[in-house]
Amino acid sequence: FLKILNSNGGDFLCGFGSAKGTNEEAYLFQKFIRQAFGTNNVDHCTRLCHASSVAALMEGIGSGAVSAPFTAADDSDCIMVIGARPEQNHPVAATYLKQAAKKGAKLLVFDPRKQNLMRYASHPVIFKPGCDVALLNSMLHVIIEEKLYDEQYIQAHVEGFEALRKKVKDFSPEKMEEISGVSANYVREFSRIYANSEKSIIFWGMGISQHVHGTDNSRCLIALSLITGHVGRPGTGLHPLRGQNNVQGASDAGLIPMVYPNYQSVEDIDVRNFFEDKWGRSLDPSKGLTVVEIMNRIVNSRIFGMYVMGENPAMSDPDQNHARLALSKLKHLVVQDSFFTETAWFADVIFPASAQPEKAG
């Protein structure tokens, strides 16, 4: 790594961290890449799951974190679940959702296919795949046209409402019915329930985020919460259900190429000065590369060295052949993991790693 750094500079090095480690490990890994390699080319698996959600949340509410824990469902009157199958993928969260439904909360479950959680739903919504934006915009249309929004909350906390009104004007449920496959009357019914409930919360998974229009999907959900005032109170909020056990913590800790810990931009000079003072060295002033861009750069001989901790891009990358070609072209690859992964076959150096039960904290 030092030879590459001295010969080519930090831009020819990168790191791929883990969403399965602790917050402290995520923080230390991104700090190591930024401090030792002198680059912001550090990422983790959020790029393959909820990066679109983080982008929309940063844009919409100023933070890439969930605005409420899944335990908030216990206080909710209306729970909306879309693009997720909590019983299979988030069983603890699913328990809270089912208990809330049993206590009388309205449960709206959106999915192109039937799922087990629909047994508890007051309103199961089966729609055509890929039509999320059309369906969600029709909900926004109903809420705005029927004046079900929270005008006081909008005046105090929301920008761009009039622009949103114009955007969704042509997305009536009647026009969208053929596209989404959901009847106009049904859309109006569950839109009214979501808007009129005192406390509504939205949960979504990678069925929302893993799309070419994933950010737009998330924007629609954020808009639904904001215009109805269902953010910032107990039993309300926005909760993207993460893919691995600590994607949220790793993101919060700065394991992302464009932000430091707490989602502070690497291009903000005041923020950068703060971290330079704390870490005792000058830092890269430019955004780093995402793992997708990193793989392309490696194939094009623009990155020579990579440190992978607790990740397995040889298996997790959507284009495995491309990822494996990239890994094979690296001049130096270090892999740190609890297991001998497919990625480790390409490594020049393999470091051990502790599994969760082996850690003291």
Which residues make up each language-model segment?
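Catalytic alpha/large subunits of respiratory electron-transfer oxidoreductases
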Residues: 1-359
